[in-house]
A protein has these predicted regions:
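N-terminal secretory signal peptides and thylakoid transit peptides that target proteins
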Residues: 2-19
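N-terminal beta1-alpha1-beta2 submodule of the flavodoxin-like/Rossmannoid cofactor-binding fold
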Residues: 31-143, 155, 225-231
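Structural recognition of the beta-strand scaffold that forms the well-ordered cores
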Residues: 63, 103, 148-149, 176-178, ...
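Solvent-exposed loop/turn segments at secondary-structure junctions
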Residues: 68-71, 106-110, 152-156, 181-186, ...
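Short, surface-exposed alpha-helical segments at coil->helix boundaries
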Residues: 83, 87, 91, 158, ...
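Helix-loop-strand module that forms the ligand-binding subsite of alpha/beta enzymes
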Residues: 113-198
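Glycine-rich phosphate/pyrophosphate-binding loop and the adjoining helix
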Residues: 205-232
Length: 232
């Protein structure tokens, strides 16, 4: 399946586990430049002001994302973020299209420490865990399109994203993945969503390097236009 990524950066698609590359892949949506916007955490579910006119049930859009602030990977080092990179990207998308926004929050929050989060993620992946979600949505049946956002941790989306996708019936919907990463691009995200969202069409995803997320608004707009979600 085709994925959309900015042309100016080649993405390593290898399954690196440890060492500098592997630890980067383990927590890839975890870096941001100095000018990354800092803002209060949004409420669990928010509805941005409509920008494209009224929507019927068939074309209503849900943007659901998981993002982790705190100590994050940054060009081989570490950096503390008030706002996680995936949230920065999700806000950028929500400014451009008419959608309802839902932040996926774990019942047991991930540690602020980068290394502790890496270790927890490895345990969850090895156990094929389904971390519980705090305040989950009651239903998504009113939507025809779902944008799913997350970092890439150890070459795939965090296991909490599988908790989310397995909780709902995506039959007949279109799913648009978007991720922030360090070295692994989309990783196995499209394949994983194909497995956990049976009956849905998995559209080409968007992968943005976490350290440079604020620099890619034009790429976000192109991706949304190619997906038919942005027409102006």
């Amino acid at each position: 399946m085709r994925q959309y990524q900015p042309n100016r950066r080649a993405v390593l698609q290898q399954g690196l586990l440890l060492g500098v590359g592997g630890w980067a892949a383990a927590l890839t949506g975890c870096s941001s430049p100095d000018n990354a916007p800092a803002a209060p955490t949004p409420t669990t579910t928010a509805t941005p002001t409509p920008k494209r006119g009224g929507a019927t049930t068939a074309n209503r859009i849900l943007l659901a994302y998981f993002s982790r602030p705190g100590e994050n990977y940054y060009y081989g080092g570490r950096r503390n973020l008030e706002v996680g990179n995936t949230e920065v990207l999700a806000r950028m998308i929500a400014e451009l299209i008419d959608c309802n926004v839902h932040r996926i929050e774990p019942t047991d929050p991930y540690p602020a420490s980068y290394d502790a989060t890496v270790a927890r993620n490895v345990r969850e992946q090895n156990a094929d865990a389904r971390p519980p979600i705090a305040d989950p949505l009651a239903s998504i049946e009113q939507y025809g399109t779902v944008l799913l956002g997350s970092p890439i941790w150890n070459v795939r989306s965090p296991m909490i994203m599988t908790t989310f996708t397995e909780s709902y019936d995506f039959t007949g919907m279109t799913v648009h993945p978007f991720v922030t990463y360090a070295v692994s691009g989309l990783g196995s995200t499209e394949r994983d969503y194909t497995a956990s969202c049976p009956g849905a069409r998995i559209a080409p995803g968007l992968a943005v390097q976490g350290e440079e997320v604020t620099q890619h608004r034009a790429d976000v707009e192109t991706w949304l236009r190619d997906a038919g979600l942005l027409t102006t």
